[in-house]
Each structure stands twice: as C-alpha cells, then as structure tokens.
C-alpha cells in the first residue's frame, strides 16, 4: 500500500511538472473527470457491485423462479449480467430487471420451495353456521365404525359435526399419497365472518410441479365439497338469481 501511494504521488508530481500545472489543479481535474465517469457509467458500476452481492450471497441463479411485482417479473431467471437480469414470465414475455434493484428492493425466490420438495396449499371453505350442531347418538355410532375415526379424541358427552368433519379431513390428508407427509399439515377454523365459518386446510404437495400442484388442490377441495353432506354440513354461498326465483315461487 505504501509503495502504491508513493507511485501515485510521484506520477502526479511528474505529470504536473510536464504540463507546468500545480498538482492541486491536476487533482481537481482528476476529481471532476472521475465524477463525470461515475455519472456516465453509474448503472454499470451499480450493476457490477449488485452482481457481486447477488453471487456472493447466493441470492439468485439462472433457472430460479422469482417474483417481483414492482417490475412485473414472475417467472424463471434466464440470464444474469452486469447491467440486467432477464426473466421469462409464465406468459412467455421477457422482463429485464437491473441487478441493483434486486439488492435494494425485495423479491421472492421460490428455489427454497423446490429444494424442500413440497409446495404449500392454504385454502379455506366457508361453512354455513346454521348447519353446525351436535351429532346424534346414531350418527356417532355410524362414525365410530369408520377407519378414519382412529385416534379420535372425544371432547365431551356430545360431539359437534364440524369437529368430526375436521378430524376426517386431517385423516384424509394424512393418508393421501400426493400430500407431503414430512411437512406440517393441519385443518383449522379461522375467525367467523358474515360469509360463514372458514375451515382452512394447510398442507404441502409432494410434487412441486405447477400442474400437479393445481390438480391436487382441485382434487382435495372437490372431495371436501362432496363429503360435506356426510356430516350434515353445507357450504356458504351468497344467494344467486335461482335462489331468489325459488323463494318467489314458494
């Protein structure tokens, strides 16, 4: 470092002597020139620094799926250069994002989901609260004969049909071959709303493929809707034109 400083100072003194100018004038000119160069190449400089940070911190790799709504990016990273990051969106459009934006702003990288081997499904169905009631003894006797009642924990002398339904759904998820059994899963109630009692299913698919993920999600909720009547429950939905028509006819 000392040798480098001596060389720099010596060079400045030699140049100032050759052009017959004060070293102070030369330093001032160099400072102004440096400022102009930084202004002209600021994107390149910031991109280079950001690129180093992205690589050093393993924040981004080609092939990663990222989402960055501010820049309209939602797809796979195609290329990372000093000045741009190219992202191919799912609609096949290509978005370019400056690397420093990925460092300064927040973005979502889905690599962890693929590495983990499970894709989260978090959806709820609204139950009509008018259909929530205690089960009769005959109903409980019928339920107890089913294999999904294994491990059932009674809450008291009378059981609520919604509680039985949640227990059934947990059994269904635990024995579904396309559900990741190594990750958390639960069926829970959310805060009641004017649209009914939300019952949320929270689990992870065993396959991270988008199409298989969507198919599993639809398959599970088709089953949920089809089994509601078994527990004498109904899903809530806003009245439609046909509902008003039937009411008028009555």
Task: Pin down the residues of each PLM region.
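Membrane-contacting alpha-helices and adjoining membrane-interface segments
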Residues: 1-56, 90, 94-120
């Amino acid at each position: 470092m000392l040798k480098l400083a001596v060389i720099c100072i010596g060079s400045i003194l030699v140049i100032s002597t050759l052009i017959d100018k004060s070293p102070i004038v030369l330093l001032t000119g160099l400072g102004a020139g440096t400022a102009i160069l930084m202004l002209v190449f600021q994107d390149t400089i910031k991109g280079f620094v950001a690129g180093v940070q992205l690589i050093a911190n393993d924040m981004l790799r080609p092939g990663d799926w990222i989402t960055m709504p501010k820049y309209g990016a939602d797809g796979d990273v195609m290329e990372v250069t000093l000045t741009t990051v190219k992202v191919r969106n799912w609609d096949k459009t290509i978005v370019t994002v400056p690397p420093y934006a990925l460092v300064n702003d927040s973005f979502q990288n889905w690599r962890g989901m693929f590495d983990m081997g499970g894709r989260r499904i978090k959806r709820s169905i609204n139950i009509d609260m008018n259909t929530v009631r205690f089960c009769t003894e005959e109903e409980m006797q019928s339920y107890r004969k089913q294999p999904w009642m294994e491990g059932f924990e009674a809450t008291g002398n009378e059981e609520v049909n919604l509680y039985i339904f949640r227990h059934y759904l947990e059994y269904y998820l635990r024995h579904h071959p396309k559900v990741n059994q190594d990750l958390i899963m639960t069926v829970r109630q959310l805060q009641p709303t004017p649209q009914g009692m939300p019952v949320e299913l929270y689990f992870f698919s065993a396959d991270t493929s988008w199409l298989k993920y969507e198919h599993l999600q639809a398959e599970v909720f088709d089953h949920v809707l089809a089994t509601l009547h078994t527990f004498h429950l109904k899903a809530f939905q806003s009245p439609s034109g046909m509902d008003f028509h039937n009411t008028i006819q009555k």
